[in-house]
Amino acid sequence: MTRDGKPCNVGQTPTKALGVTDQHSQLQLYTEGPYDKVITLIKVGAFRSTVEIPHGCEEFHDVAFLGGKTLNQLIEAERQGTEYALLKAGRMSQTITLPCVNAGTIGQLMYFFELTTAYEGELLNIDAFNQPGVETSKRATYAILGNTDAKYDAARKEMTGRPAFKPEYIL
Protein backbone atom coordinates (compact mmCIF):
# COMPACT_ATOMS: atom_id res chain seq x y z
CA MET A 1 0.00 0.00 0.00
CA THR A 2 1.11 3.51 -0.70
CA ARG A 3 1.25 6.11 2.03
CA ASP A 4 -2.12 7.27 0.64
CA GLY A 5 -3.65 3.81 1.22
CA LYS A 6 -3.74 2.87 -2.47
CA PRO A 7 -2.60 -0.56 -3.69
CA CYS A 8 0.93 -0.69 -5.08
CA ASN A 9 1.45 -3.91 -7.01
CA VAL A 10 4.98 -3.28 -8.25
CA GLY A 11 8.42 -3.49 -6.73
CA GLN A 12 11.54 -5.56 -6.44
CA THR A 13 11.56 -9.29 -5.92
CA PRO A 14 15.14 -10.34 -5.27
CA THR A 15 16.01 -13.79 -6.56
CA LYS A 16 19.37 -15.43 -6.87
CA ALA A 17 20.65 -17.40 -9.81
CA LEU A 18 23.90 -19.31 -9.98
CA GLY A 19 25.23 -19.44 -13.52
CA VAL A 20 24.23 -22.43 -15.59
CA THR A 21 22.55 -24.05 -12.59
CA ASP A 22 19.61 -21.67 -12.90
CA GLN A 23 19.64 -20.85 -16.62
CA HIS A 24 16.85 -23.24 -17.54
CA SER A 25 14.63 -22.28 -14.63
CA GLN A 26 15.14 -18.52 -14.78
CA LEU A 27 16.87 -17.20 -17.90
CA GLN A 28 14.06 -18.50 -20.10
CA LEU A 29 11.61 -16.45 -18.03
CA TYR A 30 13.85 -13.39 -18.06
CA THR A 31 14.35 -13.41 -21.84
CA GLU A 32 10.89 -14.50 -23.03
CA GLY A 33 8.60 -13.88 -20.08
CA PRO A 34 6.93 -10.67 -18.91
CA TYR A 35 8.96 -7.52 -19.49
CA ASP A 36 8.89 -6.50 -15.85
CA LYS A 37 12.37 -7.17 -14.50
CA VAL A 38 15.76 -5.54 -14.24
CA ILE A 39 18.49 -8.12 -13.90
CA THR A 40 21.61 -7.46 -11.84
CA LEU A 41 24.67 -9.53 -12.69
CA ILE A 42 27.55 -9.72 -10.23
CA LYS A 43 31.07 -9.83 -11.64
CA VAL A 44 34.13 -10.66 -9.55
CA GLY A 45 37.32 -8.81 -10.41
CA ALA A 46 39.76 -11.10 -8.60
CA PHE A 47 38.94 -14.53 -7.24
CA ARG A 48 40.70 -15.80 -4.11
CA SER A 49 41.90 -18.86 -5.94
CA THR A 50 42.12 -20.29 -9.42
CA VAL A 51 40.82 -23.75 -10.23
CA GLU A 52 42.05 -25.20 -13.50
CA ILE A 53 39.83 -27.48 -15.53
CA PRO A 54 41.97 -30.50 -16.38
CA HIS A 55 42.50 -31.94 -19.83
CA GLY A 56 41.35 -35.49 -20.27
CA CYS A 57 38.00 -35.40 -22.01
CA GLU A 58 39.30 -35.09 -25.56
CA GLU A 59 36.96 -37.84 -26.77
CA PHE A 60 33.99 -35.66 -25.79
CA HIS A 61 34.09 -32.80 -28.28
CA ASP A 62 31.37 -30.79 -26.51
CA VAL A 63 33.51 -30.34 -23.38
CA ALA A 64 37.08 -31.00 -24.56
CA PHE A 65 37.66 -27.29 -25.27
CA LEU A 66 37.33 -26.55 -21.53
CA GLY A 67 40.55 -28.41 -20.68
CA GLY A 68 43.24 -25.94 -19.63
CA LYS A 69 40.76 -23.18 -18.86
CA THR A 70 39.84 -22.20 -15.31
CA LEU A 71 36.56 -22.24 -13.43
CA ASN A 72 37.10 -18.49 -13.04
CA GLN A 73 37.06 -18.11 -16.84
CA LEU A 74 33.99 -20.35 -17.06
CA ILE A 75 32.08 -18.30 -14.48
CA GLU A 76 32.93 -15.03 -16.25
CA ALA A 77 32.05 -16.48 -19.67
CA GLU A 78 28.67 -17.61 -18.29
CA ARG A 79 28.04 -14.09 -16.96
CA GLN A 80 28.94 -12.58 -20.33
CA GLY A 81 26.75 -15.11 -22.14
CA THR A 82 23.81 -14.32 -19.87
CA GLU A 83 24.36 -10.59 -20.35
CA TYR A 84 24.42 -11.10 -24.13
CA ALA A 85 21.22 -13.19 -24.11
CA LEU A 86 19.44 -10.48 -22.11
CA LEU A 87 20.74 -7.76 -24.43
CA LYS A 88 19.68 -9.71 -27.51
CA ALA A 89 16.20 -10.16 -26.00
CA GLY A 90 15.98 -6.41 -25.34
CA ARG A 91 15.94 -6.89 -21.57
CA MET A 92 17.48 -4.47 -19.11
CA SER A 93 20.41 -5.60 -17.04
CA GLN A 94 23.17 -4.08 -15.01
CA THR A 95 26.50 -5.50 -13.92
CA ILE A 96 28.04 -4.73 -10.57
CA THR A 97 31.73 -5.56 -10.32
CA LEU A 98 33.10 -6.52 -6.94
CA PRO A 99 36.88 -6.11 -6.85
CA CYS A 100 36.99 -9.30 -4.76
CA VAL A 101 34.66 -11.28 -2.53
CA ASN A 102 35.12 -10.60 1.17
CA ALA A 103 33.06 -9.40 4.11
CA GLY A 104 33.63 -5.76 3.18
CA THR A 105 32.55 -5.98 -0.45
CA ILE A 106 29.54 -8.16 0.40
CA GLY A 107 28.55 -5.62 3.08
CA GLN A 108 28.85 -2.80 0.55
CA LEU A 109 26.73 -4.74 -1.94
CA MET A 110 24.04 -5.40 0.66
CA TYR A 111 24.05 -1.74 1.67
CA PHE A 112 23.72 -0.72 -1.98
CA PHE A 113 20.61 -2.89 -2.36
CA GLU A 114 19.17 -1.56 0.91
CA LEU A 115 19.59 1.99 -0.39
CA THR A 116 18.00 1.16 -3.75
CA THR A 117 15.05 -0.42 -1.92
CA ALA A 118 14.57 2.69 0.23
CA TYR A 119 14.87 4.93 -2.83
CA GLU A 120 12.38 2.82 -4.79
CA GLY A 121 9.97 3.08 -1.86
CA GLU A 122 10.14 6.86 -2.07
CA LEU A 123 9.57 6.80 -5.84
CA LEU A 124 6.51 4.56 -5.37
CA ASN A 125 5.26 6.52 -2.34
CA ILE A 126 5.50 3.50 -0.04
CA ASP A 127 7.22 3.11 3.32
CA ALA A 128 9.93 0.58 2.56
CA PHE A 129 10.56 0.08 6.28
CA ASN A 130 7.00 -0.92 7.20
CA GLN A 131 5.96 -4.36 6.01
CA PRO A 132 2.43 -5.10 7.22
CA GLY A 133 2.17 -8.04 4.81
CA VAL A 134 4.95 -9.76 6.74
CA GLU A 135 3.34 -9.18 10.13
CA THR A 136 0.47 -11.61 9.43
CA SER A 137 2.93 -14.43 8.80
CA LYS A 138 4.99 -13.57 11.88
CA ARG A 139 1.92 -13.49 14.14
CA ALA A 140 0.74 -16.83 12.73
CA THR A 141 4.19 -18.40 13.19
CA TYR A 142 4.44 -17.26 16.81
CA ALA A 143 0.91 -18.52 17.50
CA ILE A 144 1.66 -21.92 15.91
CA LEU A 145 4.81 -22.25 18.01
CA GLY A 146 2.83 -21.61 21.19
CA ASN A 147 3.63 -18.00 22.09
CA THR A 148 0.98 -17.20 24.70
CA ASP A 149 1.26 -13.43 24.44
CA ALA A 150 -2.24 -11.96 24.05
CA LYS A 151 -1.33 -10.22 20.81
CA TYR A 152 -1.21 -13.65 19.12
CA ASP A 153 -4.63 -14.80 20.38
CA ALA A 154 -6.52 -13.48 17.35
CA ALA A 155 -4.20 -15.26 14.93
CA ARG A 156 -4.44 -18.49 16.95
CA LYS A 157 -8.25 -18.36 17.01
CA GLU A 158 -8.50 -17.51 13.33
CA MET A 159 -6.15 -20.31 12.34
CA THR A 160 -7.82 -22.97 14.49
CA GLY A 161 -11.22 -21.92 13.16
CA ARG A 162 -10.32 -22.19 9.49
CA PRO A 163 -11.79 -24.99 7.36
CA ALA A 164 -10.00 -28.32 7.55
CA PHE A 165 -7.82 -29.48 4.70
CA LYS A 166 -9.60 -31.83 2.32
CA PRO A 167 -7.52 -34.99 1.83
CA GLU A 168 -8.80 -35.42 -1.73
CA TYR A 169 -7.04 -32.19 -2.70
CA ILE A 170 -3.72 -33.00 -1.06
CA LEU A 171 -1.08 -34.65 -3.21
Model-predicted segments: where are they?
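A SIS-like phosphosugar-recognition module
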Residues: 1-171
